[in-house]
């Protein structure tokens, strides 16, 4: 899957090998990005982060990052607009919260698009999800029993989000099952 964008009358800058920038053609440019060759790793243990080709992705806002974290935790199942609103904006009037949520989702999608990985998002009317086939996640691999990921769990799962605490008993039980020990 690739994408093609036509940019008209925009001066385009290209990073040079020595870290400088040089202007490219002004006029119509077709930008093609092959997103098949992008490696995406999502880390949930000891904090939530997303890596694209080994580099940490920075998010436009903490709410955009948390929104993605919620979708990742649901492992491909959809999160309704109401659920997402409650988790991100618990103490805000519903209409305002839903408007905020739309803006946050737009920013998240644009940020992921800048890195060629917006394909991980699935948006349907009134619900949000991630396509779990598009990335590797320590949480998913741990649940599958992948030995390379079992040792990564140190008892901490997205500690920056209070709602993630509900998953810890399940993860600790799995860890005990895999290792025959306590954590």
Show where each model-derived region lies:
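Intrinsically disordered, low-complexity protein-interaction/activation regions
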Residues: 5-183
């Amino acid at each position: 899957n690739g994408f093609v964008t036509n940019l008209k009358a925009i001066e385009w800058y290209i990073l040079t090998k020595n870290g400088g920038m040089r202007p490219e053609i002004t006029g119509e440019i077709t930008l093609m990005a092959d997103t098949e060759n992008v490696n995406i790793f999502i880390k949930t243990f000891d904090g939530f982060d997303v890596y694209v080709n080994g580099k940490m992705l920075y998010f436009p806002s903490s709410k955009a990052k948390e929104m993605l974290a919620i979708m990742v935790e649901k492992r491909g199942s959809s999160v309704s607009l109401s659920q997402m609103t409650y988790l991100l904006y618990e103490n805000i009037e519903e209409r305002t919260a839903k408007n905020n949520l739309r803006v946050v989702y737009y920013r998240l999608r644009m940020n992921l698009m800048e890195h060629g990985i917006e394909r991980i998002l699935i948006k349907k009317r009134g619900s949000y999800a991630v396509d779990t086939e598009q990335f590797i996640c320590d949480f998913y691999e741990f649940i599958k029993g992948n030995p390379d990921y079992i040792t990564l769990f140190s008892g901490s799962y997205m500690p920056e989000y209070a709602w993630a605490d509900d998953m810890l008993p399940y993860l600790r039980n799995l860890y005990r099952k895999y290792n025959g020990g306590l954590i």
